[in-house]
Amino acid sequence: HRFDTADKAKGNRNGWYVCPSLEVAVYGFWHLGIQENVTTGGNADPAAAAEARLAAQRAREQREAELRAQQAKTAEQARRWWTAAGAADPGHPYLTKKRLAPHSLRQRDSMLLVPLFYDGELVNLERIFPDGAKRPLFGGRAKGVAGLVGKLAGAERVLIAEGWATAAALHEAMGLPAVVARNADNLEAVARRLRQRLPDDVAITLAADDDRFTDGNP
């Protein structure tokens, strides 16, 4: 069974619980990595504890299967949208406000589309609206995905930025390929994957946003 947690938006369904018997209940929160067991016999009941571990394992396996299915569905949607979209309008309000060229962006209605890749496959899209709001497609892979402004082939140095606009501005100013990690939480995962892919003599520089004093940032 799944339920919403109070610290996330409505519909998040990050909480879960299973009751394999009248003597055992297991609950947890996926986004926090928390899992707790409750047994009528207390922790000293080995049979109940074993039952709780098995129930938790089954819950994890079910959750992982659901995630894979949803991510595959979102990836298919991303590919359909990307294929059907046209080149981004250089006069799009977001681009004119940022004074940036569209580069490889595409556009669907009023939304700019930033392609996000994982292991070379298009798995998600970040939508940028005219007012600057940014939203990925629902249910898509998030950790380790990245976009790109410029080309990696032949590069001696590669930059990793958080947002697309920062990456595009760096590319235009420095002529270097700039990878889009989307947010600070994804910088490390993207950097590690990029390091594995690129030759050892290619330098990688993190160009993180200087917003450490913003409320809620680490």
Question: What does each model-identified segment do?
Answer:
Residues 57, 61-149:
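Conserved phosphate/metal-binding and DNA-contacting active-site motifs used
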Residues 73, 111-200:
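Phosphate-handling DNA/RNA-contact segment within nucleic-acid enzymes
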Residues 108, 181, 207-209:
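Conserved beta-strand termini and adjacent loop/short-helix elements that scaffold enzyme active sites
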Residues 201-214:
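Acidic beta-strand-to-loop metal/phosphate-binding motif
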Residues 30-32, 117, 128, 209:
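Structured loops at beta-to-helix junctions and adjacent beta-edge loops in soluble globular domains
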Residues 189-193, 213-218:
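Active-site-proximal loop/helix of nucleotide/amide-processing enzymes and allied scaffolds
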Residues 1-93, 211-213:
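Non-catalytic accessory segments of DNA primases and related replication-initiation nucleases
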